[in-house]
């Protein structure tokens, strides 16, 4: 595993996102959980984002820590997420995790699909 780093120029994990993840982990009652963010093929624009909780840290994962929360990214997904911002927003249309990705050449209206 690559060391946990606080490097905003590589990836921004906002306070809002970290605090919401902490709240969700507390609700699960398992402090070993970490948030895994990944990119997979699919969606209407070619790639889509995914979020899951994971207790396992793979040797080649990159880990980011913020407010006591660990964010994990696998090497394939990492290349698509460099420079991205992971945020949590609440508004009239509901609440959701949002990825603002400067590497995306286009995005879908659903907000979870992009092309690079």
UniProtKB/Swiss-Prot annotation:
Signal peptide location: none
Chain sites annotated for binding iron-sulfur cluster: 44, 108, 110
NCBIfam families linked to this entry: iron-sulfur cluster assembly accessory protein, PRK13623.1
Subunit structure: Homodimer.
Protein name, as recorded: Putative iron-sulfur cluster insertion protein ErpA
Required co-factors: iron-sulfur cluster
UniProt similarity note: Belongs to the HesB/IscA family.
The keyword Metal-binding is assigned to this record: yes
């Amino acid at each position: 595993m690559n060391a946990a780093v606080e490097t905003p120029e590589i990836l921004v994990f906002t306070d809002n996102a970290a605090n919401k993840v902490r709240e969700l982990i507390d609700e699960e009652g398992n402090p070993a959980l970490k948030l895994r963010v990944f990119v997979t093929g699919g969606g209407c624009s070619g790639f889509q984002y995914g979020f899951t909780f994971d207790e396992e840290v793979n040797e080649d994962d990159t880990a980011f820590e913020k407010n006591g929360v660990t964010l994990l990214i696998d090497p394939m997904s990492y290349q698509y997420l460099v420079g991205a911002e992971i945020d949590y927003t609440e508004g009239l249309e509901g609440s959701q995790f949002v990825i603002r990705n400067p590497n995306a050449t286009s995005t879908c209206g659903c907000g979870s699909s992009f092309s690079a």
